[in-house]
Swiss-Prot record:
It comes from Methylocella silvestris (strain DSM 15510 / CIP 108128 / LMG 27833 / NCIMB 13906 / BL2). It is a peripheral membrane protein. Its EC number is 3.6.5.n1. This is Elongation factor 4. It is found in: Cell inner membrane.
Length: 601
């Protein structure tokens, strides 16, 4: 590998909403610069996990180094950083963007600006990026490039008059994108003689190499055999391999300022390599770490239990392996009377939860039940202590509680005008507080403060269904606010079912409880005795349904004759049922749990 002057390096990322063609554009850039031989070209080269390809989303940051000979005759190194676009991975996005100096903003010329586009553009602007707008899919009959340019100027405030027009699918305009990267994005700044300072962008576990760390060198030089230190984790290692991605790994001797590449150092656990940490030289450390590092904080919690109790050990092993790769995922053991042994897991958000669950089921062949997702509540007790509550079943005695605080989010929703009424109604139902509402062309942008508790359940699905899939949604957690929350328990035959207990707002408890008991009534099969299903807050029953008993027709053998004879047989049956009900155990089928937890709030 020949060394390039720092002025000929460009580090850039691509910012886009799901399905606006980010990965396809990346494929075309890789193809155009000849980084991958034509026969090795697969769709979405950078999305390496199957789930990423199937869902069309990018989960981990990926990078590729492209070499490009520009129109001015100079050879440039272009480092493309493919970032996740989903809100759950917002912190990973901000770190990936911190590794670059510029971004391509890809907008679908037929769809226009979406909520996630906005969120990620703001991340890019916060990172001080130069942004080049790119209009994709101009080959579609529905494309309206002029209108979308105007929209970019109105909504984001970027000058879009020089936007690059492309069709990533057919390959039109890709060379213009490459020229724009070289001419309109700035080169990195860095001092080769200063002490080593590098940003840890991402890390993953490889069975042969241990942990592979994706780094962006800011100052100094990173060499093979160098002793390094991770500043936030305070871990020390010796670099044993350095290289760059062209998308396949290729070894190099060193990484200079402005370069993006990978290192391995026989690191055993991903927990030592935290995204956003600063890597420096052990002997000659840099004075201060790079700003913006935050340890990953789980936001959503839920219990994961194996359907078959015999799979518990396999589940434990599988979680350990996923944890190697994903330090933002945390778990601890828990047991539930209804579901047996399992784990209480913490996630960055709902998509993260779905992905982890899907990876456990897919990569490790496990059948899992997930309990209702819950958020972290802060409980201020009468004696002044504050505790964090991850699981509604562990709620302390209500008489000891002063206040319960719940997390709130600021949500930005972009929706076509026609569906605005339904969207506002949904936000109102979810205890939302309107902050702002304005129009962007034919679309409305509503900004709401909402309790996260109301969003984790099924808000996203409901939003998509009432807007026929057109509304887009993005959120950031803002603060904790006190709320009138109560713990709702579900009792089946007077026995509380711990897996179904949840914290709800007092105003919504009645409806939530009623829906839950009606749902369970359909799902629990009839037994030989009648089964009451109740929703309760403390000792007060707020909703009840009864599953009727199966009964034999005891009077069938009486033909005509005395009514008192029939009465006697019926009374005898009644007494038997009553006794049975005292001793009977109700079997709740697994499907009932799964369906009740998927319940539409």
């Amino acid at each position: 590998m020949t060394a390039h002057p720092i002025k000929n390096i460009r580090n850039f990322s691509i910012v886009a909403h799901i399905d606006h063609g980010k990965s396809t554009l990346a494929d075309r850039l890789i193809q155009q610069t000849g980084a991958v031989a034509a026969r090795d070209m697969v769709e979405q080269v950078l999305d390496s996990m199957d789930i990423e390809r199937e869902r069309g989303i990018t989960i981990k940051a990926q990078t590729v180094r492209l070499e490009y000979k520009a129109a001015d005759g100079e050879a440039y190194i272009l480092n493309l950083m493919d970032t996740p676009g989903h809100v759950d991975f917002a912190y990973e996005v901000s770190r990936s963007l911190a590794a670059c100096e510029g971004s391509l903003l890809v907008v679908d010329a037929s769809q226009g600006v979406e909520a996630q586009t906005l969120a990620n553009v703001y991340h890019a602007l916060d990172a001080g990026h130069e942004i080049v707008p790119v209009l994709n899919k101009i080959d579609l009959p529905a494309a309206e490039p002029e209108r979308i340019k105007q929209q970019i100027e109105d909504v984001i405030g970027l000058d879009a008059s020089h936007a690059v027009m492309i069709s990533a699918k057919t390959g039109v305009g890709i060379d213009l994108v490459l020229e724009a990267i070289v001419t309109r994005l700035p080169p990195p700044q860095g001092d080769e003689t200063a002490p080593l300072k590098a940003l840890l962008v991402d890390s993953w576990y490889d069975a042969y190499l241990g942990v592979v760390v994706l780094v962006r060198v800011i100052d100094g030089v990173l060499r093979k055999g160098q002793k390094i230190k991770m500043m936030a984790a305070d871990a020390h290692y010796e670099v044993d391999r350095i290289g760059v991605f062209r998308p396949k790994m290729q070894d190099a001797e060193q990484l200079s300022p402005g370069e993006i590449g990978f290192i391995t150092a026989q690191i055993k656990q991903v927990a030592d390599t935290r995204v956003g940490d600063t890597i420096t030289d052990e002997r000659r450390p840099c004075a201060q770490a790079l700003p913006g590092f935050k340890p990953a904080q789980p936001v959503v919690f839920c219990g994961l239990f194996p359907v078959d109790a015999a799979d518990f050990e396999d589940l434990r092993a599988a979680m350990g392996r996923l944890r190697l790769n994903d330090a933002s995922f945390s778990y601890e053991m828990e047991s539930s009377a209804a579901l047996g042994f399992g784990f209480r897991c913490g996630f960055l958000g709902l998509l993260h939860l779905e992905i982890i669950q899907e990876r456990l089921e897919r990569e490790f062949n496990l059948d899992l039940i997930a309990t209702a997702p819950s958020v972290i509540y802060k409980i201020v007790q009468r004696d002044g202590d504050t505790i964090e509550l991850h699981n509604p079943a562990d709620m302390p005695d209500p008489t000891k509680i002063e206040t319960i605080e719940e997390p709130w989010i600021r949500a930005t929703i972009l929706t076509p005008d026609d569906y605005l009424g339904a969207v506002l109604k949904l936000c109102q139902e979810r205890r939302g507080v309107q902050v702002d509402l304005n129009y962007v062309g034919k679309r409305a942008m509503a900004v709401y403060d909402l309790p996260l508790n109301e969003v984790v359940f099924d808000f996203y699905d409901r939003l998509k269904s009432i807007s026929k899939g057109y509304a887009s949604f993005d959120y950031a957690i803002t603060d904790y606010r006190p709320g009138d929350l109560v713990k709702m328990s579900i009792l089946v035959n007077a026995e509380p079912v711990d897996a179904l207990s949840m914290l709800v707002h007092r105003d919504r408890a009645d409806t939530r409880g009623r829906v839950m008991v009606e749902k369970l009534k359909e799902l629990i099969p009839p037994h030989m005795f009648q089964i009451p299903i109740q929703a309760a807050i403390g000792g007060k029953i707020i909703a009840r349904e009864t599953v009727r008993a199966l009964r034999k027709d005891v009077t069938a053998k009486c033909y005509g004759g005395d009514a008192s004879r029939k009465r006697k047989l019926l009374d005898k049956q009644k007494a038997g049922k009553k006794k049975m009900r005292q001793f009977g155990k109700v079997e709740i089928p697994q499907e009932a749990f799964i369906a009740a937890l998927k319940m539409d709030g």
